[in-house]
Regions:
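Short, structured coil/loop segments at alpha-helix boundaries
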Residues: 2, 40, 112-114, 153-164
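ATP-dependent adenylation/nucleotidyltransferase module used to activate substrates
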Residues: 1-77
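Peripheral terminal appendages
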Residues: 87, 128-187
Length: 187
């Protein structure tokens, strides 16, 4: 994780009196990478997310806890998450809230503004930003996602064509991420 993000996370945990533990995943990641052929940023990010989740599930088993999901509706609809990584959880209280709604909810809860203003990032590699990777702000994305859900043809027709193309492509390409694995019975 980025040092500033780690510092912020620790500060938030301490201010809320939450138990926390920091585990350095780089040695685990390095061991995996040494066994892999040419690894791009996407594969490295997915691997990092899966290592994090493996450690979270192990720690939850040790402590008798449940892993809480943090993926929101925008990320889920776009497939902007890693199967068995950040998408894995026992339950997800914010899974039906769009990213822009999360910002509003955070304000309502009194989350310090510095956290609300932070650029959304999985922090999988240096300089990574959701909106940079997606090419659009979540406010724009969410407006279109909500219009698509309501079949608001006027809003859809007025949407930026590149945004519409990106959203439709991601929804179609990543739909499988929103389903449980297929189980073949009684074939």
């Amino acid at each position: 994780s980025n040092k500033a993000n780690l510092k912020d996370a620790l500060m938030l945990c301490e201010s809320l009196n939450l138990e926390h533990k920091t585990i350095e995943i780089q040695p685990i990641l390095d061991a995996f990478l040494s066994a892999c052929e040419s690894v791009c940023k996407t594969r490295m990010g997915n691997l990092s997310a899966r290592i994090r989740m493996s450690l979270l599930y192990d720690y939850s088993a040790l402590k008798g806890y449940l892993v809480v999901g943090t993926s929101n509706k925008s990320e889920r609809m776009l497939g902007y998450g890693t199967i068995y990584g950040d998408l894995a959880c026992a339950f997800n209280p914010i899974g039906e809230l769009h990213k822009s709604d999360i910002f509003e909810f955070a304000r309502y809860l009194g989350v310090p503004q510095c956290f609300v203003d932070k650029a959304p990032s999985a922090d999988l590699y240096e300089g990574q930003s959701d909106e940079k990777e997606l090419g659009f702000k979540y406010a724009e994305i969410d407006e279109l996602l909500k219009a698509l859900k309501r079949v608001d043809t006027q809003k859809i027709a007025r949407a930026d064509k590149n945004l519409l193309e990106m959203v439709e492509k991601r929804i179609k390409t990543n739909a499988f991420k929103n389903s449980m694995p297929l189980i073949f019975k009684d074939i």
